[in-house]
Amino acid sequence: MLIRIAATPAFMPALMPVSAHAQLRGGLKFPADFGAHPEARTEWWYVTGSLQSGVRQWGFQVTFFRSSTGIEAAAGGRFNPTQLLFAHAALTDLEGKRLRHDQRIARSGFGIAQALGDDTCLVLRDWQMARTPSPTDAQRSRYRAQVASETGGFAFDLQFDATQPVLLQGEAGLSKKGPGANDTSRYYSEPQLTVQGRLTFEGKPLEVTGRAWLDHEWSDAFIPAQAVGWDWIGMNLDDGSALTAFRLRRADGSAVYAGGSFRRAGQMVRSFGPEEVTLTPGRMWESAASRARYPVQWTIATPAGRFTVNALLDNQELDSRSSTGAIYWEGLSDLLDEAGRRVGRGYLEMTGYAAAMRM
């Protein structure tokens, strides 16, 4: 997933001490870099995955965004909106063929919203997500996310446990997002998270298990001026591997820049250069709500292989104009190999199809 706060709405004119398991990885220092970076203009923590209870399956998303407004606190005291927090949550009901979603927005502070800087600790009204070291391995993470949506008719309280080391995207965590020298972000992933917890769906509590993917990214940079949006996948493969691929896209559909990575379980990450990744759109679906046309099938060529991505539900479009200002597509999808066999599952994200992203 790429940084995606598209517009600013009306607001704009007990953790382990660092010394317990601090480590430096390519300029990123953990656990501090699990936390917020208020000096960066834009930042997000993003978790997507699949859930199962019996034979029934769902996809889910929970994302917290932090945006620095550039307004000095001294100008208006503690009431000045120096930091804004946003959150999105979504649930894809495969059996019911329906996406449910909700969103939140608030200025930081006043006991309403916060993003702490020493570790992942995010609160936005009644939604929250936090990280602690795993009780079985202090070098790995355990996350907990709690979300409830009356309008969406769902709630979840989920625990995510890391099974692999942190995956540093790009060059040791410095990820290129365009041809320019400043088109970069700090970016790491935690793929292959095991999930367990409770999903409340249409008033019925269900114990669920699953697999998830977490991204954390922050930057002062924006997408290149010639880009109108992007296409991205984060896939957990059944053999324990993790695949990322993305492209930033011009209005004519050509790529401004592309990248990604692949890591087999227990091995080093292989980052992809812009000439090594090709994302080719296939079958299209038109949204009745926005009239945007999205490719819900993709062919993706990488040094790790050639794959097909198939959306498991066509209508996974989210309207976030009440918070981050964009309409985008974010949905549970399968990953197929060249023989058409399913080899993984994860999320596909597409932006800039309803309207060009302006950041």
Range-by-range predicted roles:
Residues 21-359:
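Structured soluble/peripheral alpha/beta segments that form catalytic or ligand/cofactor-binding pockets
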Residues 1-20:
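N-terminal export signals
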